[in-house]
């Protein structure tokens, strides 16, 4: 598969990128090089290779899922210019 100048202009238009006429040949070459590399990757034999998400084995640290109030509600509300009944008080915007 190869990209022509019209396709480069179409991609630029869809991406809302301004591309000058003199830039089109360079971008066309870049896109064709990327597509050639992707085609080269598709030829690699991956039969029997386990899929992985990272080259380094990683595990997420797990914690107990406990519902709490965050333990800092008073500190958070202390930053508010106005509060009422432990809630932020904001100006009315809709009548």
From Swiss-Prot:
Signal peptide: none
EC number, as in UniProt: 6.3.5.-
Keyword ATP-binding annotated: yes
One GO BP: regulation of translational fidelity
Catalytic activity annotation: L-glutamyl-tRNA(Gln) + L-glutamine + ATP + H2O = L-glutaminyl-tRNA(Gln) + L-glutamate + ADP + phosphate + H(+); L-aspartyl-tRNA(Asn) + L-glutamine + ATP + H2O = L-asparaginyl-tRNA(Asn) + L-glutamate + ADP + phosphate + 2 H(+)
InterPro entries tied to this protein: Asp/Glu-ADT_sf_sub_c (IPR036113), GatC (IPR003837)
Organism superkingdom: Bacteria
Entry keyword Nucleotide-binding: yes
An MF annotation (GO) of this entry: ATP binding
Enzyme class, spelled out: ligase
Gene3D superfamilies: Glu-tRNAGln amidotransferase C subunit, N-terminal domain
Keywords, ordered alphabetically: ATP-binding, Ligase, Nucleotide-binding, Protein biosynthesis
PANTHER family in UniProt: GLUTAMYL-TRNA(GLN) AMIDOTRANSFERASE SUBUNIT C, MITOCHONDRIAL (PTHR15004:SF0)
Family label: Belongs to the GatC family.
Protein task: Allows the formation of correctly charged Asn-tRNA(Asn) or Gln-tRNA(Gln) through the transamidation of misacylated Asp-tRNA(Asn) or Glu-tRNA(Gln) in organisms which lack either or both of asparaginyl-tRNA or glutaminyl-tRNA synthetases. The reaction takes place in the presence of glutamine and ATP through an activated phospho-Asp-tRNA(Asn) or phospho-Glu-tRNA(Gln).
Quaternary state and interactors: Heterotrimer of A, B and C subunits.
HAMAP family for the chain: GatC
Protein name as annotated: Aspartyl/glutamyl-tRNA(Asn/Gln) amidotransferase subunit C
Organism annotation: Afipia carboxidovorans (strain ATCC 49405 / DSM 1227 / KCTC 32145 / OM5)
